[in-house]
Amino acid sequence: MPATRTNILATLGRVLIASLLALSAGAASAEDTVTLPLTIKDHRFEPAEVHAPAGKPIALQVKNLGATAAEFESTVLHVEKVVAAGAEALIHVRPLEPGRYKFFDDFHRATEGFLVVP
């Protein structure tokens, strides 16, 4: 019986250490997040092209200055978010490989922009 208790305690200790390491790794990646401001005004994204480094998590701080709601969407980034008139939204994007990623306002399809990762 004492050997079983020792094994259980050893396993719990390993799980605790692994959990703490996972939490500290998550905190480090949150600090690495690149936040990019993006405004929707008069059915246009400003700027129309935003740049982010490869391999880093991205947060797009989208502010809708328009009089109507906008739907920020990107099929290639797998994100979709309705932003009410006068409101802001924080849109998280996974770390990306170099490329040019299109996004658009699904309510006004001519409104489009690009996230460029050099």
Question: What is each residue range found by the language model?
Answer:
Residues 15-19, 28:
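Cleavable N-terminal signal peptides
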Residues 32-37, 83-118:
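Extracellular/periplasmic metallocenter environments
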Residues 48-50, 78-82:
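Beta-strand-rich interaction surfaces with strong enrichment in secreted/lumenal proteins
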